[in-house]
Amino acid sequence: ELVQKFVTSAKVAKEAGFSGVQIHAAHGYLISQFLSPHDNRRTDKYGGSLENRMRFLKEIYLGMREELGKDFTIGIKINSTDFKEDGLTEEDSLKTIIELANLGLDFVEISGGTYERPAMMGATSKSTNQVFFAEYSKKLKQKIEIPVVVTGGIRSINAMNTLLNDNTTDFIGIARPLTI
């Protein structure tokens, strides 16, 4: 029933004229909690192994794809890690993204942390001057062919150009720099 509510929401977006949706599977919200072994203590088919923990997200994605067709863009925002002890690891995050990319996902936006443990409050990456998830994005881009969006800590045009020119990411997600 809950999966169908996500599918219906995406259908409403399409009917309203949007060309795509992004499934928010990051930051400790519901889908992120299913993915994280720290939060997901279920003993049914939605808990335990990574395959089981990603089942909810896969069912949402596949339901949307079936309902909306191949021409409707569907992406996800997902944590590289949730920075919790016994939480979602980079390895599990990579496996989840690869699985979804193989199912036809259109793009992935990389983020990290939860509102309990916000990654974007921490130190910035020295190798890219400001960006929080650049190293993870580089690893990911070697494993998938769909576009990758990096967000978090990107504050300057120089950093943006570096990320794009060295093939760290395909797109840059910015919010705070546009509002401050």
Locate the predicted segments by residue.
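Flavin-dependent oxidoreductase catalytic cores
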Residues: 1-180
